C-alpha cells in the first residue's frame, strides 16, 4: 500500500527548490487517483501564498516551424539572463495514446541539463481538460519553486492553443515564410489569441529575406484586422536554431505585459482562474462518471446499441446520466 503523502513536508521542499520535490509535486497534481486529488488540493492551497509575478507565455506554431528548437533557444537565453525557466506542454495526443510526450527533453538537450531550467513532458490524461488541469497546476508548483518564467508549448492540433491561451499572460505564435498568402496555413482563430508573432527560421541569406518579406505582409494584414487603440500583435523574424533575434521576441513579450498593466494582468489572471474553476468541475465530473458503478454496468451494452444504430446518442446520454444520478 502506498504511504500517504506528507503534504506539509512536500510544500517545504518545493519552496526550498528541491528538484526531486518539484517532480513529486507535479506527479501528484497530475494523478487522477481520488486520494492523490485530495492531497493535490491541499498542496496547492498551501502553495497559493507564493509570489504570482512569474511571466507565463504560451507558444504554438504551424507544423514544421521548429517550435522545440525555438523554445530551447529562448529558454537558454533567459537562463543566461538569470531567470529560472519552467517548460510545460499541452499535448492532445496524450489523451488518445495514454502516454506522455517524452520527446520534449530529447529535443531540448541543452536546456534539459541546465540547472536553472525544468522541463516536464505533457501528462497523460483521459481528456484534454485533464491535461490542461494538470498543466495549469504544474505551473503553480513551478512558480512556488521559484521559476519566474513559464513557457507552455502546445503540441499537435485541436483546441490546445485556446486551452493554453486561457492560462498564460502572453501567447506567442510561430510561423514560416510562405509563397503567396502569408495567412495561408494559419488556423482560423489563431490570430484572435496571438499576442506576438514571430516568423522563425530567418537564418542568413535568402531565408532571412523571405522571412522579412513575410513578416511585413503579415503585419500589414493584421493592421486591417485590429481596430485603432487595441494591441496589434507585432510580427518579428527570428532564428531559433542560431538564437538570432530571440532577444527581440522576448522584449516584445515583456512589452505586451507592460501593455496589460498591473491591474490588467491581475484582471486577466482572475478571469482565467474563474474559467479554470469550471474546467475543474467538468474534469471532476468526467472522473466521477468514469468511476460510477451504475454507468459501468450499462456502458458496454449502450456502446453496442449506439454502434448498431438501435439507440440514438441523446437517449444513450440520458440513460448514462440517469444511472449516474442513481448511484
Q: Where does each model-flagged region fall?
A:
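Flexible active-site lid/hinge loop adjacent to a nucleotide/diphosphate
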Residues: 179-209
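Conserved phosphate/pyrophosphate-binding and hydrolysis machinery centered on Walker-type P-loop NTPases
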Residues: 15-16, 29, 33-37, 64, ...
